[in-house]
Amino acid sequence: LTDTDTYVTAVAPFLRDRGLAAPDADLLRAALPHVRARARTYAEAAFALDYFFREPPELDAQAAARFLVPDAGPALGELADALADVTPWRADVLEERFRTWLERTGRDLKQVAQPARVALTGRSASPPLFDVMAVLGPARTVARLRAAAAMAAGG
């Protein structure tokens, strides 16, 4: 298995080919473990890593049509508010806050997880949701959830 520094150097040109100039090396190192096992080539890794670097993430039209629907808008906005003050910003803490919020609001994981995934990644398939949030960081996670809430609501 290629060591992380070598992999980072090798995948960077493929990210540039996707229009992502000079990807942040620290962000790349943080995101890499979440996509590396599934990527068979550096090009596949660059595709899998794309949404960690692109603002806003490219939306898969089918995923958006299926999951960013009007009913999802309020939930995504409320989720953004519920996560905005999480500290420390780690996957386990985010999951705990998310599940507490679900219980408090009477929502089901199935109602919110896929719309949140599409909001954060632009796709219906990704690494675990809380890992994605942890790598994206609080500002981008909350901003993407709010943008998707507005989109889902038709605004």
Feature annotation, model-predicted:
Residues 1-2, 43-45, 122-129:
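Short helix-capping/linker segments at secondary-structure and domain boundaries
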Residues 3-105:
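Small-residue-rich helix-loop
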Residues 92-152:
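Charged substrate- and nucleic-acid-binding regions of tRNA-handling and nucleotidyl-transfer enzymes
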Residues 155:
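Metal- and O2-centered redox machinery and metal/ROS homeostasis
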